[in-house]
Amino acid sequence: MADLLMKMPVPYEPKRVNRFIVRFPSSLGINEWYVTSAKRPSAKINSVEIPFLNTSTYVAGRFTWEALQVTFKDPIGPSASQALIEWFRLHAESVTGRMGYAAGYKKDIELEMLDPTGVVVEKWILQGTFITDLNFGDLDYNNDAIATIQCTLRMDRCIQVY
């Protein structure tokens, strides 16, 4: 008879959602400690219908990597908002109306999950990443919370290194 209260056969250490680092290229000036939360990569595969008579069969179609949301805290100095808006200006400049070249604004970002001792146990490389949405948040006289910035990042592809 099976013992339903049996403990797990192998002790393990789970990955924790509060042990992660998002690394941006040093040329952007976006420090790792600015990040307060981030989503892990997610992918979507389209299903393609193949109709035949009264039935349908499905096969996998194109796949896409979903956009990633990252939240930053915004200290006075060094300013996260200034670093992010400088990267945004490589995409589009609101003063002159000029648009940037993809080679200039697309960057490779690294997302790392850590074990309890700080060793990287999961690493993603987000290739060709750029900003699609940048929200500097709300201000409120009735609130003493830390100012945050919401950013949506779109990437060409994600590679899980390990």
Predicted regions and their residues:
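Glycine-rich, low-complexity intrinsically disordered segments
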Residues: M1-Y162
